[in-house]
Amino acid sequence: MEGTNEGNVFSCAMRAGLYLGGWFILRDSIEMFVYSNVVSVGAVFLLALLSIVSLLLTLYIITKGTDVYKREVLKENVSYFKVLNYGFYLFFFASMIYAVFIFLCLTLFNPEMLSDQKNFYDSVFTQMGTMEGASTEMLNSFKSHYDKGFEGLLSQSPRDVAMNNLFGETTYGFFLCLVTSIFLTKKISK
């Protein structure tokens, strides 16, 4: 009986992870388009809006997926750790899909993806420096931090970038699920 529930955990998590991984890919595709085609300070606000939408859609997918998992697998046996376990698997499967996408992008489709991102931020910092009231010292400080980060990122192999994304997204999901699991453990009302 326990093995069946464990299999169902993976099945439910893989299904929701497919949706979440698809969203991560769509989000990154939009970001890649912005990085390579739009060079303005306004694009930064577009990316910030995309981040907010991404968080909201991620929370929606977690909530809906957990709801299905509670209804189909857990029935009345809902606990914080079971919901947290499900959320971890959901993010792990989504992150695996996303890491494969990143690897394929960096090796086949768009090897210049990270360079485009660096060039985008270089242009934005240059534009911000010409704005009235801009603090040159602060911008130079931010730019030096970005340059160091991108220098490290650009020196990594596509495999390393993909593995770092796998680890990073899974860790992000785990911490997000630590909080969301508190609210998603309530019993199912009939």
Give residue spans per PLM region.
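Alpha-helical transmembrane segments with an aromatic anchor "belt"
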Residues: K70-F91
